[in-house]
UniProtKB/Swiss-Prot annotation:
It catalyses: L-glutamate + ATP = L-glutamyl 5-phosphate + ADP. Residues 275-353 form the PUA domain. One of its GO terms (biological process) is L-proline biosynthetic process. It is found in: Cytoplasm. HAMAP family: ProB (MF_00456). Catalyzes the transfer of a phosphate group to glutamate to form L-glutamate 5-phosphate. This is Glutamate 5-kinase. NCBIfam families: proB. Keywords: Amino-acid biosynthesis, ATP-binding, Cytoplasm, Kinase, Nucleotide-binding, Proline biosynthesis, Transferase. Pfam families: AA_kinase, PUA. Belongs to the glutamate 5-kinase family. It comes from Pectobacterium atrosepticum (strain SCRI 1043 / ATCC BAA-672) (Erwinia carotovora subsp. atroseptica).
């Protein structure tokens, strides 16, 4: 790929600490140098940084605290300011300004908030400012869980309209088996599609400070590739790794973007976590998959969760297959009332209607 590129670089806690209990500043200095070099060459760089909790623990002198959500939030609140201060200090050596964006998955659930975040991201990039993004761990609750910053980096790549997403980790890439305990494990260089076989060989990282593993990196790669973004998983310790990815030099494991990526509007649908789910019968399933039809209330069997009109929900088959992510035209209570009924009965049952379909085909992404 020639010309100016937009690259999102995700740095996990294991990369930032080198497996220790404190931030490895020498290594972070080197990564900033690589980013600054590419920035000077005209490329747009976005940083997705982990490490707030580790930075907070270090700043407080490694206190003995209970392993609770509240403790993680406390450490994140203390560490986040230390972390952004470090990024700001190091990038300033090269005359580069940074802009902090603290996000949660909730910022991706609402269309307006998604667009606002996208506008902020693009404004920073247009003004040659490096966005530094992290999960807002100090206020997030359910979001503090395995894989948040992996998945967050894929969503950041969508917000930035990135060309590539680089997931830096403590492993050289994705292997055929866990290289820590299998000497015959081989590095997988190229991936053109993520399937169940690939997911089954993804192992978890050994770091006790972070929240990510290889399986969540596959999830992130899947989201980004479907949005038309190439993804590379590589070792953060490899010299010149950021420049290699920009230059398309083979490094780590590369996941190729789909030839027919999701349209811009559907990026948000695919990235948003489902607020609930519905199960459809075989007739509706066939209409959706084979004819590209909208979903009518008649084909709905069950409704799970409580969600509002306009939220993203999951569509499942009777066999339990995850069929699609979609924006619902009706809330969960309304869907329970009209499920199994003909479209002509909607107004009679509800006293109002938003049209004859429960989900329009343009608001649906088939998995």
């Amino acid at each position: 790929m020639s010309g100016s590129q937009t690259l999102v670089v995700k740095l996990g806690t294991s990369v930032l600490t080198g497996g220790s209990r404190r931030l490895n500043r020498a290594h972070i200095v080197e990564l900033v140098r690589q980013c600054a070099q590419q920035h000077a060459a005209g490329h747009r760089i976005v940083i997705v940084t982990s490490g707030a909790i580790a930075a907070g623990r270090e700043h407080l002198g490694y206190p003995e605290l209970p392993a609770t959500i509240a403790t993680k939030q406390l450490l994140a609140a203390v560490g986040q300011s230390r972390l952004i201060q470090l990024w700001e200090q190091l990038f300033s050596i090269y005359g580069i300004h940074v802009g902090q964006m603290l996000l949660t998955r909730a910022d991706m659930e609402d269309r307006e908030r998604f667009l606002n975040a996208r506008d902020t991201m693009r404004a920073l990039l247009d003004n040659n400012i490096v966005p530094v993004i992290n999960e807002n761990d100090a206020v997030a609750t359910a979001e503090i869980k395995v894989g948040d910053n992996d998945n967050l980096s894929a969503l950041a790549a969508i917000l930035a309209d990135a060309d590539k997403l680089l997931l830096l980790t403590d492993q050289a890439g994705l292997f055929t088996a866990d290289p820590r305990n299998n000497p015959d494990a081989e590095l997988i260089r190229e991936v053109t599609g993520i399937n169940d076989a690939l997911r089954s060989i993804a192992g978890d990282s050994v770091s006790g400070l972070g929240t990510g593993g290889m399986s969540t990196k596959l999830q992130a790669a899947d989201v980004a590739c479907r949005a038309g973004i190439d993804v590379v998983i590589a070792a953060g310790s490899k010299p010149g790794v950021i420049g290699d990815v920009i230059a398309d030099i083979s490094v780590g494991t590369r996941f190729h973007a789909l030839d027919t990526p999701l349209e811009s509007r559907k990026h948000w649908i695919f990235g948003a976590p489902p607020a609930g789910e519905i199960t459809v019968d075989d007739g509706a399933l066939s209409a959706i998959l084979e004819r590209g039809s909208s979903l009518l209330p008649k084909g709905i069997r069950t409704v799970e969760g409580n969600f509002s009109r306009g939220e993203v929900i999951r569509v499942r088959s009777l066999a339990g297959r995850d069929v699609a992510h979609a924006v619902t035209r009706y809330n969960s209570d309304a869907l329970r009332l009209i499920a199994g009924h003909h479209s002509q009965q909607i107004a009679e049952i509800l006293g109002y209607e938003y049209g004859p379909v429960a989900i329009h085909r343009d608001d649906m992404i088939i998995n």
